[in-house]
């Protein structure tokens, strides 16, 4: 998968944003296999049993947040994660806040700007930012 394909998939994802499938569509946009997504959706690979959370070992921790501050939520989650997730993501579907736990950098954007910030999640596609520079 190349960068232009990722950008194109992100544009489609945002145009037809579905809160129920957002995190799965995001992972698919970066080349995750449909079989992994299927197992994640049905709970086999989801390490979290809390509604609105998706936790995939070494990849991500995702949480829908509506009634609390996104910044406070991501800070609390980042200090408590247990499965070496690379990315912590929280969103209210207006704002997307993500932290790369390996590089210790944060993305804080309007969700509609996700395609412009495609490079943040490139490690999911096997590309580190240093490889692009």
PLM region spans:
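Nucleic acid-processing catalytic cores of prokaryotic defense/repair systems
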Residues: 1-133
């Amino acid at each position: 998968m190349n960068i232009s394909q990722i950008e194109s998939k992100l544009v489609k994802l945002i145009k037809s944003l579905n809160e129920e499938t957002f995190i799965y569509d995001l992972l698919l946009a970066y080349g995750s296999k449909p079989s992994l997504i299927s197992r994640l959706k049905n709970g086999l690979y989801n390490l979290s049993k809390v509604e609105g959370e998706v936790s995939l070992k070494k990849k991500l921790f995702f949480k829908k947040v509506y009634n609390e501050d996104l910044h406070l939520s991501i800070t609390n989650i980042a200090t408590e994660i247990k499965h070496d997730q690379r990315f912590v993501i929280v969103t209210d579907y207006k704002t997307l806040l993500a932290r790369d736990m390996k590089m210790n950098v944060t993305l804080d954007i309007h969700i509609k700007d996700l395609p412009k910030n495609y490079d943040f999640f490139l490690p999911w596609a096997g590309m580190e930012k240093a490889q692009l520079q």
